[in-house]
Amino acid sequence: GEMPEYKDMIKAAYDKGHTIGMHTYSHDYAKVYASVDAYFQDLDQIGQMVQEEIGYVPCFIRFPGGSSNTVSKKYTAGIMSTLVQEVQNRGSQYYDWNGSSGDGSVRTTEELVAQATSFDSNNIILLCHDSHGKQTTVEALPQIIEHYQSLGYTFKALDRDSFVAHHGVNN
């Protein structure tokens, strides 16, 4: 959101058939989780930016830190219970993950591949970050994809019928 130099990547990903979801505009936990209204103001801001690129506001969301984050209660106690319900009331679906590459902390490509390929659920939503400084994620991704394809997994764009991973909400 706050990095307009990457805005054109939204359209490029969309044109390649990827589902575009929203995270936040600011990714500032103190701002986003200051109140329910603050969360939706930030979400609306990223929604408007995405709409300029692809022609509509996506209905798929991932909360900063996931729905199970414990940071939000530092700013507003109980906010996650309200937000998970309210995003669905507004017609959106939020996604968490049931597998993580571990790229939220600095790791080598080999460590990311080992972590990301350690899951064996029927449906896997794997958390990887595409932000600045995640070159090891970019390097690991082909190996991760190859691993799961060799096990018979398929990769599909999310839609309303996709498997949804939800964490337990922490307030």
What does each model-found stretch correspond to?
Residues 28-54, 69-123, 134-140:
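Alpha-helical scaffold elements lining the catalytic groove of polysaccharide deacetylases
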Residues 1-57, 147, 163:
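Active-site beta->alpha N-cap acidic-glycine motif
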Residues 133-171:
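C-terminal domain-boundary segment and adjacent tail
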Residues 7-11, 81-85, 142-145:
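Short amphipathic alpha-helical segments and helix-helix/interface helices
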Residues 19-24, 59-63, 93-98, 124-128, ...:
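Structural recognition of the beta-strand scaffold that forms the well-ordered cores
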Residues 1, 25, 64-66, 99-102, ...:
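Active-site beta-loop-alpha junctions enriched in small/polar residues
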Residues 1-6, 15-16, 105-127, 134-136, ...:
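Accessory recognition modules or surfaces
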